């Protein structure tokens, strides 16, 4: 490098990870306008600057694993995130925002009994007399538990991934369950929510109590992602705003055969990546066993039934059976399980 050379420093984000690229140009290779130069900040050698990095896993921040029942969608997720902190919930028709995010709930606590003069009452042995009393406390549910855990990791130079796993996402009314959290699903190139949302006063108070003392090492870089010079990290710590960090993964499963329960609208779908889990032989050697000693290969049965579904009048991919549709013990699927689960499903939902 010689005097007069030009060095171009370019910052970019790839899969949520901030990277820097240096490009060198000779004096005659590029023209640089004086207006391009701006002194941003003088950084002392003693100051440490952390890039927006995080330990990554293979897969997008938000994705739905879908396929026929029994294809191993939950098993696939477990294998991918087993070593990381994860929080699991299952949607159903009665799931609502409070059950997913959190709300005030009555709980029973033991408290001292006070006399008329305001002193604690004691029994004959001198022990304080206690009574049960109903109080209301804000109870965090799966979303807030994962949210807080992910921001706690942001206190480290390389935050570890935190997973929020939603089983059977289409069995619940997603619009009702997510509410305004829906807006947080829009992520920028760095993996943080594009549009922070304002938390209600009750939630803000509880989040401030938990997040207020967190030391976010990448606060300056995170704030730089947002226009207007706002200290969004301070807003997150105060609880006034909600913002998904780039290490919070939200993965869900969906049985395509159940998609008619609560249809997912197109706006919600666009905010997710979709991963199809196809039907395949898991090579476990499962066998259907009967009391008379007869045994039948499970995969051969599945293949024959799925071929009938595909080639017959049904012709619906989502009605097929996956390898893990029936639970096997010691590699055997009992006659009772086969009749009560497999044949019942085929009779009731397929044929």
List the predicted regions and their residue ranges:
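C-terminal regulatory/interaction module of P-loop NTP-utilizing enzymes
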Residues: 5, 11-17, 21-351
């Amino acid at each position: 490098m010689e005097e007069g050379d030009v060095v171009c420093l370019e910052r970019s984000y790839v899969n949520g990870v901030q990277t820097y690229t240096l490009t060198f140009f000779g004096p005659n290779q590029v023209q640089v306008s004086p207006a391009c130069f701006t002194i941003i900040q003088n950084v002392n050698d003693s100051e440490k600057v952390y890039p927006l990095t995080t330990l990554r896993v293979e897969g997008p921040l938000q994705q739905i694993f879908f396929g026929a029942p029994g294809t191993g969608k939950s098993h696939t997720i477990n294998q991918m995130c087993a070593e990381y902190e994860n929080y699991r919930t299952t949607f159903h028709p009665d799931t609502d925002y409070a059950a997913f995010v959190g709300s005030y709930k009555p709980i029973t606590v033991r408290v001292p009994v006070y006399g008329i003069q305001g002193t604690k009452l004691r029994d004959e042995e001198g022990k304080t007399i206690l009574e049960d009393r109903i109080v209301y406390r804000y109870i965090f549910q799966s979303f807030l538990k994962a949210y807080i855990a992910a921001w706690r990791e942001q206190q480290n130079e390389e935050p570890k991934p935190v997973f929020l796993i939603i089983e059977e996402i289409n069995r619940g009314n997603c619009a009702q369950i997510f509410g305004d959290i829906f807006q947080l699903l829009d992520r920028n190139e760095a993996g943080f929510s594009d549009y922070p949302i304002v938390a209600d006063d009750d939630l803000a108070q509880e989040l401030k109590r938990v997040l207020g003392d967190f030391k976010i090492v990448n606060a300056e870089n995170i704030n730089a992602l947002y226009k207007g010079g706002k200290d969004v990290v301070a807003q997150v710590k105060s609880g006034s705003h909600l913002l998904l960090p780039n290490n919070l993964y939200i993965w869900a499963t969906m049985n395509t055969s159940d998609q008619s329960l609560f249809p997912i609208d197109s706006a919600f779908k666009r905010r997710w990546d979709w991963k199809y889990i196809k039907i395949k032989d898991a090579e476990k050697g499962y066998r259907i066993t009967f009391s008379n000693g007869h045994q039948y290969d499970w995969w051969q049965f599945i293949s024959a039934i799925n071929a009938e579904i595909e080639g017959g009048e049904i012709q619906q991919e989502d009605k097929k059976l996956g390898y893990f549709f029936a639970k096997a013990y010691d590699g055997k699927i009992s006659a009772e399980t086969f009749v009560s689960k497999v044949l019942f499903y085929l009779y009731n939902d397929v044929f």
